[in-house]
């Protein structure tokens, strides 16, 4: 079966509509960065500004993992459990409810199983249309009527952009050089790829800034060492 047929088969076992309406953030967070925490903040702001949607106060954040891609430690050095622990310990994910799933459809389906209904999905422009399409096609009312779903477009996710490895590495290294020179990095340049590369090069202070833990050096070092051991 192809991917669409697989989803169609899974659709047959979807739970009824959940009673708790949520805004959903889906990602690998490998590792979690200050960019991810900025996303959580943006989603919380959206929830506050749209009371008419009757959303839960905090976003549902689904950590993607558990599939074959986890075997590639270069891209996925931290386990799902480790990613969740680091985000909770950061103090930057207050009000967030964490879940895990192997892919986007499983994430939305799992939320329904737990009594949540995905109403808003937040993602970068590369992934957002696909997520919205899944929700609109498969996640309907119990009598088959359409549910109005909303998209929250976020700044580009560097890890989701398909570029040649050599070009991507050059861009990442250029950003890291700038970070070492002036100690600052623009939020739109932050990515999990940047954090992993900082570990590869031994840039521990820069890594702490990328992951938003420059004021929690103990936790930053623990994450740095975990990633270094896995690479």
Which residue stretches match the model-derived regions?
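Nucleotidyltransferase catalytic core that binds NTPs
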Residues: 2-231
